[in-house]
From Swiss-Prot:
Main localization, broad class: cytoplasm
UniProt name for this protein: Bifunctional protein GlmU
Subunit structure: Homotrimer.
Gene3D superfamilies associated with the record: Hexapeptide repeat proteins, Spore Coat Polysaccharide Biosynthesis Protein SpsA, Chain A
Start and end residues of each stretch annotated as Linker: 226-246
Catalytic-site annotation from UniProt: H358
GO molecular function annotation: glucosamine-1-phosphate N-acetyltransferase activity; magnesium ion binding; structural constituent of carboxysome shell; UDP-N-acetylglucosamine diphosphorylase activity
Gene Ontology annotations for the cellular component aspect, listed alphabetically: carboxysome; cytoplasm; membrane
Positions of region (N-acetyltransferase): 247-449
Length: 449
């Protein structure tokens, strides 16, 4: 039987944040979620998340699954105290207990599996991950005696000689839970921090093993915003390298960010300052950017999107968007259409070969095939209480500076006069015009101030 305990009770004081440390995000996922994802790969029987500081907030981030259990640690008196609380809450201490911190977002499932395999093969009381750091400031030092761990000394309790040891504790343990439960309550807070250390169990257990991991990048804990940024960079580099090996070009990859869920096709060019978030999909032969943000949207083949934002929308094939366009949620832009500069589209459908080239707002609308929307067109869709729809049939020509006061339904091949305010429906092949006749007053003199 395998149980997992994720330590997520700390305040994270050095983050200088009102948000619990484990809820800070890297590439769209919280630190806690990344640790959970790695643990789930092990197929454990149960996962305990030990919370404390702002427990209710942290609890909301835990999956709603019967495998997950919340254990509240009050007060937060150290890692050893956290496991003491867990052992009191859980009556059956069977099999293995994997313990790790909730702030190690880069830990690989494969490394955790290696630890479990070592533990099983040697029938250990405890096995833990260690690594060597050239400048190990802040980490507990691990001291070996032959093949076994003799003791672990926390940084603040080290003397000068002990601080020279470069073998550090990564904070990932696999215990024989039954044996651990017999000694856990003997731990005391006899140290400079006045906390109960889980590392003190090592000297009480006979068969304590070390799994030394060479790549200590994955063991990076997050204690401040600098380390958060470093981990973000590691993950982003990994994501972008994967896409580049699959045929994607980044013009300036350091200035771009890509979510792990995003899909990008071959021969896509990602220009500088482009950010692709959530479940976005960019199909082949597109040019995206520069200065473009796409989230939870599908972009078809051979599209060009520059200096624009696209949220939760469908962009079909051979479409040009931008510069400075804003495609808001629930919009669908059909193939061979064009959205030009300073255009906002919201909850609207544009059929094939439609054009909205300049300075327009299209909201809650259906625009027919091969329709041209003139500069400055506005769909006035909100009456102060609810939104209304505008429908414009195919092959229509909308004059510059037209305002549609929705609800409006225009037929096919309708033309509107420039500057019109359209308040009534129009039939097929009609001209809709609504403006006062121009009056010229000759010999007019402006009043002088």
């Amino acid at each position: 039987m395998l149980s997992v305990a994720i330590l997520a009770a700390g305040k994270g004081t050095r983050m200088e944040s009102s948000l619990p440390k484990v809820l800070h995000k890297i590439s769209g996922k919280s630190l806690l979620q990344r640790v959970i994802d790695s643990c789930v790969e092990l197929k454990p029987d149960q996962i305990f998340v030990i919370t404390g500081h702002k427990s209710k907030e942290v609890e909301k981030a835990i999956p709603n699954d019967k495998k997950f259990h919340v254990v509240v640690q009050e007060p937060q008196s150290g890692t050893g105290h956290a496991i003491q609380v867990l052992c009191r809450e859980v009556k059956k201490h069977q099999g293995k207990l994997l313990v790790l911190n909730g702030d190690v977002p880069l830990i690989r499932p494969s490394t955790l599996k290696r630890l479990l395999n070592l533990h099983d093969s040697k029938n250990a009381d405890v096995s833990l991950i260690t690594t060597k750091k050239t400048h190990p400031h802040g980490y507990g030092r691990v001291f070996l005696k032959g093949d076994f761990i003799e003791r672990i000394v926390e940084e603040k309790d080290c003397n000068d000689l002990e601080r020279e040891n470069e073998l550090i504790n990564a904070g990932v343990y696999c215990f024989n839970w039954g044996i651990l439960s017999e000694i856990i309550n003997t731990l005391q807070s006899n140290n400079n921090q006045k906390e109960i250390y889980l590392t003190d169990t090592i000297s009480l257990l006979k068969n304590s093993l070390s799994l030394e991991v060479e790549d200590n990048g994955e063991l990076q804990g997050i204690n401040n915003r600098i380390q958060l940024s470093e981990c973000e960079e590691i993950i982003q580099n990994s994501i972008k390298e994967k896409h580049m090996l699959n045929g994607v070009t980044f013009i300036n990859k350091a200035s771009c960010s890509i979510s792990e869920e995003a899909e990008i096709g071959k021969d896509v060019i990602i220009e500088a300052n482009t950010h692709i978030r959530g479940n976005a999909k960019i199909n082949s032969h597109c040019i995206i950017g520069p200065n473009t943000f796409i989230e939870n949207s599908n972009v078809g083949l051979n599209c060009e999107i520059s200096n624009s934002t696209v949220y939760a929308s469908q962009i079909m094939d051979y479409i040009k968007i931008g510069p400075y366009s804003h495609i808001r949620p629930n919009s669908e832009i059909s193939s061979f259409s064009k959205i030009g500069n300073f255009v906002e589209i919201k909850n609207s459908q544009l059929e094939e070969e439609s054009k909205v080239n300049h300075l327009s707002y299209i909201g809650d609308s259906i625009i027919g095939r091969s329709t041209n929307i003139g500069a400055g067109t506005i769909t006035a869709n909100f009456d102060g209480q609810k939104k209304h729809q505008t429908k414009i049939g195919k092959n229509s020509s909308i004059g510059a500076n037209t305002v549609f006061v929705a609800p409006i339904n225009l037929g096919e091949s309708v033309t509107t006069g420039a500057g019109s305010v359209i308040t009534k429906d129009s039939k097929d092949n009609s001209l809709a015009i609504s403006r006062t006749e121009q009056v010229n007053i000759e010999n007019w003199e402006r009043k002088k101030s």
